[in-house]
Amino acid sequence: MGRNIKIIKKNLAFLNDFSPGILACLIISVLAYGLEILEKQLFGQAWLESLVLAILLGSITGSCFTLPKYFQKGITFCAKTLLEIAIVLLGASISVNAVLSAGWNLLASIIFVIFVTLILSFTIGRLFGLSSHLAMLVACGNAICGNSAIVAVAPVIKAKHEEVASSIAFTALLGVLIILFLPFLHPFLNLSFSQYGVLSGMVVYAVPQVLAATASVSFVSVQIATVVKLVRVLMLGPLIFALSILYHRSAQTRLRLHTLVPWFIIGFIFMMLIRSSNLIPEKTLIPIRFIAQLFTVISMAALGLGVDIRSLKKAGWRVILASTCSILILGVCSLIMIQLNDLNPIMF
C-alpha cells in the first residue's frame, strides 16, 4: 500500500513539474495542424507544413513572451525526450540493406566535407578575430552536430565558459533558420529527393532537426538525411580523439569517447536491425511513422519556444558572421560533392 502511494505521489509530482510546458507545446502543435488544414482548404495545398508552423509559432511565442520557469521542464522534455523517441521510431522505416546500398562513396564524401568545413571555418573564424578556441568551437559546431559538438569539444581544448556561451548563443536561431529555409530551396537546387536528403543531412545541426527539414519534401529525403546525419554525429568521436592529441590532453579524456554516442542513436540502429530481420510487421509501420511525426511536431513547438531572437546580442557580430560563413561553406561543399560524386543513394 505504501509503495503504491509513493508511486502515485511520484506521478503527481511529474505532472506538476512537466504538465505546464507539455501543455504549451501541445497547444502550439494543435494550432500548427489547424493552420496546415486551413492552408489546404484555402490554397489546395499546404505551403508550410505543420512541422515548420510549429517552429514558427513557438519562436514567435518564445521571443515575444518570457514564459515562467515552471514551463521549462515540460518544454525541455518535449524538445529532447520526445524528439529522441521519434528518431528511434524512425529506425523502423530503414533497413540495414538500405544503409549499405549508400556505399563507401557517400561515407567518404561525408568525411571529406566535414574535414574541409572544419579547416575553412576555423580559418575564417580566426580572420574575423575570434580566439583559436572560439573559432574551433564554431567550426566543430557547424561541421558535426551543433551544440552537442560544442559542449563535447570545449573541455578537450580548454575553452572558457564565455567562449562556449558565445558559440552556443547563435546556434539555436541559425538552426531554426536552416530548417525553415532549406525546404524552400529544394525546387531551385535541381536535386532529387535522395540528393536533397544528403544535403539536409550534411547541413542541419541536429539529428532530430533533420525530420523538420525534410518531412515536407519526401519521406525518402527523411530516411537518407537521417542516415547521413547519424554518420556525421558518429564522427564526433574521432574528432574528439584527434583534438585531444592536438591539444595534448590526457588519456583519461580520450577514454570517454563511448559517452559521445547518444542513446537514441543506439535505439535507432536497434530498430533498424529489427526491421531488417523482418520482426516488425509491415502493417505497423504506418502507425509508427504517424507517432514519430506527431512527436516531432510537438518537439518542434518546444524547439521554437527555446529560441529567443534577443540572443543575437549575446553572440556578438564576429561569431554571427563566422557561424553564417561556416554553414554556407558546409552547404556549398556538400552541393559540390553531391554533383561531383553523383550522390543519389536509394533507401528502401
From Swiss-Prot:
It holds the Pfam family Cons_hypoth698. One of its GO terms (cellular component) is plasma membrane. It comes from the Bacteria. The chain crosses the membrane at residues 13-35, 45-67, 74-96, 106-128, 135-157, 167-189, 196-218, 223-245, 257-275, 285-307, 319-341. Its main location: membrane. Keywords: Cell membrane, Membrane, Transmembrane, Transmembrane helix. The keyword Transmembrane helix applies. It is a multi-pass membrane protein. InterPro entries: UPF0324_pro. It is found in: Cell membrane. Belongs to the UPF0324 family. This is UPF0324 membrane protein BH02290.
